[in-house]
C-alpha cells in the first residue's frame, strides 16, 4: 500500500529537503551539532564550516573543500554584519539561498550579512557559534540575533539538563550515550537486566553517577539525595538573563551594535492563517511530538518570554524588536508566511 504524501511536501516541496537536513545532524565538539558542510542543493548551499551562502553561484569555484562565506566580496559602500539564530535565521524552508533573511537584508540595507544561523540551536549555542567564528569576522558593525523560540520551550521540553549550561536538542541522547560507554561491569549487567529482562527504560546518566558515588562514598548513595530538581520557569529566566549578558559583553568588546529580534510564530503574531498554513498546521496537529511542542509555545509563553527579553535588553543596553508585533501591525492576514 502506498504511503500518503505529506500535505506540507505537496504545498512546499522544499520542506522535504529541510526535514531530511534536520534529522541528519552533523555532530560537532563543544557546540554539539551544526549544519553539514559543502551542501549543494537547489534550495540550500553551505560552505566548509556548514554556514549558508547568501547567493550561491555554481559558476564560481565553490566546489573547493576550503570554500567559505567569509571569502565573499562586497562593495566598499557596504559594512560587515552578522545574522545569527536558529531555523528562522538559517532560512529553514526557503526555496533558495537568495530567499533567506540574510540575503534579503543584503539587498535592502547598507550591510553585507554573514549568516551564522543553525536550525535547532539554543541561545547559548548561538553564542558559542559566534565566538568560535569571531576571528573570521573582520570589521563587523552590526549583529542581529533572530531567536527566542527554542529557548522559550526547551527548559520545559528537555527533562534533564545542566542547570548552568542549559538544555539543547538531543540533550538526553547525548547524556545516555556518553554514560553507557562509561558504566562499570556491574552497571552494564544491570543495564542488560533492566533493558532486556524487565524492559524498563533507565536513565543511564543517573545510573552512571550513582555507580560512581556508590564505589567512592562511605555511605549508601541515593540519587534523590543530591539531585536538584530544576524549575523550568527559573531556568528560563536565568538563561535569558545570562545569554543577553554575554551578548552585551561581546558587543561592547567588539564595538558592534546588537539588536535582539524575537522570531515570529504563527500563533504569537495573531494573524489569520492562509489556506496553506491551515492545511499544514492541521497535519502537524496529528503528530504527538509537534502537538506537545505547540502546547509549550502558547500565547502565555509568548508574553512571558517577550517580557523577560525586553527586561534584560534594557538591563544590558541591547536594542529589541518583536517580529510578531511587526507582522501584526502590517496586517499580513491570510498571507502565507509560515511552514
Residue ranges and their predicted role:
Residues 1-95, 99-107, 329-331:
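Membrane/wall-proximal cationic-aromatic binding patches
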Residues 88-95, 115-116, 233-237, 298, ...:
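Second-shell loop/turn segments in exported
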Residues 82, 90-186, 191-194, 198-204:
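Conserved SGNH/GDSL esterase-like catalytic core that processes O-acyl groups on lipids
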Residues 115-117, 262, 322-325:
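Residue-level recognition of beta-strand->loop/alpha-helix junctions
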Residues 78-79, 110-112, 138-142, 254-259, ...:
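Loop/turn elements at helix/coil->beta-strand transitions in domains of secreted/extracellular proteins
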Residues 150-308, 328:
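Serine-dependent acyl-ester chemistry module
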Residues 308-322, 332-339:
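Histidine-centered active-site loop/cap adjacent to the catalytic His
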